[in-house]
Amino acid sequence: MAKIVWDESGKRFYETGVKNGVLYVQDESGNYPKGVAWNGLTAVTESPSGAEATELYADDMKYLEIRSAETFGATIEAYTYPEEFEACDGSAAIANGVNAGQQDRKPFGLCYRTVVGNDVQGNALGYKLHLIYGAVASPSEKAYSTINDSPEAITFSWEVTTTPVNLDGFKPTACITIDSTKVEPGKLAELEKKLFGDTSTEAQLPLPNEIKAMFAEE
């Protein structure tokens, strides 16, 4: 039996950053066929909720505990957003350059990348890809103010709820995370080709079952 050792060199891990955001507007079939870059992404706060305990009693004692379903939400913050996101934010074009608000909000998917680092390699150790499915953005305020001697760009913010999608052998999920330090590089490259596209293929967001099959052990 090995003795526990704390804070070994190379095992002091951390996570930081957010970049390489990609928006995928969901189509009528529930797929995410065309991704576009989300420039100016500054923060994504993942906010799972639910899984609340209900205690059941019998024979004058605690009998068991059951938990409610868990849901996944998030907050997205950015200095700007892709034009394609306007349909996800309740806006519809009635003419070129003219939009009407308070319209139906299209569901969307999102991909973004965060850094995985340690005490030896720093931020170069690796990264995680975060994939979100079935997201719907809630209305949010936009606070415009006069330009002064300390100008600041507006930071847009959206609260997001999700509807999970099927994952064979597991409960439905709205989020998938891929750790570059643990998966096979070739399979990761195959996934990134789908997520980000190349000169011959459009970027698209594969569904969880496709990702499961892609990374299945041979």
Regions found by a protein language model. Give the residues of each.
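Short, charge-rich amphipathic segments
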Residues: 2-9, 23-28, 88-94, 114-118, ...
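Membrane-targeting and insertion segments and their boundary/processing signals
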Residues: 43-50, 132
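Polar/acidic, low-complexity leader/linker segments enriched in S/T/G and N/D
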Residues: 1-46
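Mixed-charge, glycine-accented linear interaction segment located at domain edges/termini
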Residues: 139-142, 146-218
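Structured, beta-strand-rich domain cores
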Residues: 62-140
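Short, well-ordered strand-loop elements centered on a beta-strand within folded domains, enriched
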Residues: 14-24, 31-35, 124-131, 169-177
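Oligomerization/assembly interface segments of phage tail-like spikes and tubes
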Residues: 46-48, 56-57, 61-85, 150-165
